[in-house]
From Swiss-Prot:
Binds to muscle nicotinic acetylcholine receptor (nAChR) and inhibit acetylcholine from binding to the receptor, thereby impairing neuromuscular transmission. Expressed by the venom gland. This is Short neurotoxin 4. It comes from the Eukaryota. It comes from Naja annulifera (Banded Egyptian cobra). InterPro entries: Snake_3FTx, Snake_toxin-like_sf, Snake_toxin_con_site, Toxin_cobra-type. The keyword Transport does not apply.
Amino acid sequence: MICYKQRSLQFPITTVCPGEKNCYKKQWSGHRGTIIERGCGCPSVKKGIEINCCTTDKCNR
């Protein structure tokens, strides 16, 4: 699986995720505005955080 990886204000890069079947994109509102995180897997999230998990290469754009 190939996913985009990104933390907050960084530019998204692609990464290979051995053994993973999902990519995710999650976002929430913070004191600096909307915060976006992308990566491998499909983590559980706290209330108030929106997450979208997907199952194809680079699907978390």
